[in-house]
Amino acid sequence: VKIRHKPLRTLVSTAVLGVLATGALHAGGFSLYTEGAGYTTGNFAAGVAAEAADASTGWYNPAGLVLIRDQQAVFAGVGVFPTAKLSGVSTYSMINPPPAQSLIYSEVFNNINGAEDAFVPSFHYALPLGENATFGLSVVSPFGLATDWGPDSPVRYQATFTELITTNISPEIGGRLTEHVALGAGLDLQYARVKYNRILGAPHIMNALALNPMLADSLTYNKGHSFGVGFHVGVLGMFNDNHTRLGVNYQSEMRHEFYGYSRLTGPLAVPGNIFAPTFPQLGVFQSDDLFSNAIDLPDVVTISAYHDVNEKFALLGSLVYTAWSSFKTVQLTNVAAPRFATPPPLSVVGNFSQVKAISVSPQNYTDTLRVAIGANYHVNDKLMLRVGGGYDPTPTNDIDRDVRLPDTDRWALSAGAHYQATNNIGVDIGYTHLFTSSDPVINRTDALTATTSYNVTASGTAGANLVGVQATWTIDKEPPAPTK
């Protein structure tokens, strides 16, 4: 086997910078399963652990690398264009025991938008190591989330801007065990960055004083980083002269513990009294030792099948089990926050100072099973068409679901194409439309203190369009020998 090494360091550096610079948006919880390559948007990633279409098989099932017999680089990206609109009512309540007066402030809203467009790039590389083994390298973003409701929105006390970006670098190896069985494994080195913001305020008090309810609003900005290590392993069965393939891939759970800082900006960031004539005075209070609990991103099991019906037509399918039940809560410690003094004496009424607080957000996700089916049709030697679709249930529940991720069950329809432009360059395009089986529903209550709570009750519309593009460079492929 002739191997001509290309500037791999340059290819990988470019790919890593691309993924690090990207925002991401949720798909199926906040999994970016379909976005691991570009061509997968053309069939909703049906059969992805068995097809071994290109070097991206190193991520979806590294055993499939044995079928990549030429050095290859894949550059891909998926544009995510979502819809997330909510209508409902938010209620900030202070329920005091009699004879004290209870204070309630409500806002009614209609079709507020929290969706954020995103671009998710990926890079894959394959290098044959003799006749029976292939090395691979994948740079992907397996999980991501971005919603932005804005600091003035009616749901600001639950969330404003939320972002999760992950970058996963995986060296992989696939080897043929027998004529019909191949094994593969990859090491997952994953960097994650999170932003988890909201507004803290006292709209119930300001409203009772006939003042602007937003007068005390202060932004708590929380940012953290984490690094985790995991793995993925796969097996591929090849039968019927390789026209029938069965693949299984296991992606391990990834544990993250985020460390960073928390910054409170606004009137509640400096000591004062909300009844003082000088209120509000703007300030900044920062906590530099913010950290989270151990957050376990789920392990994933993919079972895929691929079958060539004839020389032009192939069928594909996948079952993807995601163990979301590992994601139970998000707890941030040392969050920059205000603390109001509790009387008696009455002289302290309205006084507030700054503290490093603990913020707990229950999630209690449940495991999900995603289904995808698809087909390939070879029009000629240069053009292949793809279609697919499937069902992807939400892991969220009706009690803990909040506006950071207004998720619901969804169906998918996909179409795409591969065009072999030259002997060495192939181009893929794909499109997936995600539409919901029911409207997303929010009915979340956050306990802020022993007597104060914040509730958002809403329903709305959700969906997304995914547009994938991919260029596959087969670096070492020799041109076909002339026939004359």
Regions found by a protein language model. Name each.
Residues G64, G79-T83, A185:
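Short active-site-proximal "capping" loops at secondary-structure junctions
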Residues N43-L65:
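Single transmembrane alpha-helix segments in multi-pass membrane proteins
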Residues K2-H26:
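Gram-negative bacterial Sec-dependent N-terminal signal peptides
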Residues L103-V108:
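Short glycine/proline- and acidic residue-enriched helix-loop micro-motifs
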Residues G28-F44, V48, L86, I95-Q101, ...:
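Outer-membrane beta-barrel porins/channels
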Residues A46-V48, Q72-F81:
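Short strand-turn segments of transmembrane beta-barrel domains in outer membranes
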